[in-house]
Amino acid sequence: MAAVAVVGAGKSGQAAARWLALGGRRVVLWDGRDSEALRVVAGALAPFGVEAVLGREFVPEEPDLSLVVVSPGVRWDHPGLVAARARGVTVTGEVGLAWESLSHRRWLCVTGTNGKTTTTALVGHILKTAGLRAPVCGNIGRPVTDLLLEPEDYDWIVAELSSFQIESAQGIRPEVAVWTTFTPDHLNRHGTLERYAAIKAGLLMQARRAVLNGDDAYLGARRSAWPDAWWTSTQAPAAVSLAGKDICIENRPVLPVSAVRLPGAHNLQNVLMAVAACHLTGVGDAAIASGVASFIGVPHRLEAVGEYRGVRFINDSKATNYDAALVGLTAVPAPSVLIAGGQAKTGESGPWLRAIAERCASVVLIGEAAPLFEKWLRAQDYRAVYTAHTLERAVPMAFEQARAQGAQCVLFSPACASFDQFRNFEERGDRFRALIAALAS
């Protein structure tokens, strides 16, 4: 029996390995890391016949290897993948694997640098409100291959796709695709901004209908390149736009802006894109309005997690780059106390640093980026900087700063990846939430 290699033992790799093994394939799961948690994963997959290789980078050593399935966290130019392709072995991502078996379903895919999680979740919520079976999956937390393990007669598959997932699922052709925003991110993975943009654009070019955010500077400047797309804008005429106090589809009022429960101008952009996408699926105005009005947001994105002694705590762990963190800063009342830091990324930090100086009473820093961020802030003559190193120390420090300086809230918006101290932004946000619960208990 030909072997299948699954590279990466995260959620998507586990789901892919399980489904392939249940289909009678001989599966070897590879992960360059080794930990107690991964050994637990290996033990859970062993009854399905999955062999696990931990602590070694993937090499295509099986002579009868027929397929390699790649998790999103594994570089597409990983030497093992390059060697496999050179041998003529098919290499695909977990999303590409799912597409092969679910291409007969209607897919609605959302991508973008920022805003994609909220937009994806809102689309799923609206479709559910309309009575449709539309599971939400992909980069939002549930592997797409989970749908293969629980086959149902879905009306739509709503998938949030990162650039990593699109890169390794090049055959995917959604019915509707949404591009939320575009700013520099993941350049350590993709190399150039042009390559990063081309990956995002590729998804929309293969879609039957495209939705783009006209308020995004990069996308709006390329409007002529997408003449058949559905454009949205909070600032200018568009297929879905604002007129007075209403959200309109082709100048037809659908619901009042006041019905939107999400904070911040950026979330109004997300709402307009979700409205456009759901309209293109055939959902009526009443269901769209009801879905938007009943949607309260997603975990880890400007999530209110508690209040203690007059100070509100906001979990924005999903803000893993400067642009997302800037959005968070401008969405909460000033002055606030900011907790930031983690594993620093490349990108333009200037607007974020200026917003800190204008809106933050003080900043508490954690993680690897703390010395760099302190240097940047002090170079701007911003002095209210404190280093806590860990989230456990940062929370009480930030609370005391808020009380002392009359700040209304503590905002945890890292502007960094989480991998220096946590497995992902979800674990980081969950830890912040738990610390706030302990503080208030």
From Swiss-Prot:
Keyword Cell division: yes
Subcellular location: Cytoplasm
Recorded GO CC terms: cytoplasm
Enzyme Commission number(s) of this protein: 6.3.2.9
Lineage: Bacteria, Bacillati, Cyanobacteriota, Cyanophyceae, Gloeobacterales
Function of the protein: Cell wall formation. Catalyzes the addition of glutamate to the nucleotide precursor UDP-N-acetylmuramoyl-L-alanine (UMA).
Family per record: Belongs to the MurCDEF family.
Alphabetical list of PANTHER family matching this protein: UDP-N-ACETYLMURAMOYLALANINE--D-GLUTAMATE LIGASE
Protein name, UniProt field: UDP-N-acetylmuramoylalanine--D-glutamate ligase
Catalytic activity: UDP-N-acetyl-alpha-D-muramoyl-L-alanine + D-glutamate + ATP = UDP-N-acetyl-alpha-D-muramoyl-L-alanyl-D-glutamate + ADP + phosphate + H(+)
GO biological process: cell division; cell wall organization; peptidoglycan biosynthetic process; regulation of cell shape
Residues annotated as binding ATP: G112, T113, N114, G115, K116, T117, T118
Catalytic EC class: ligase
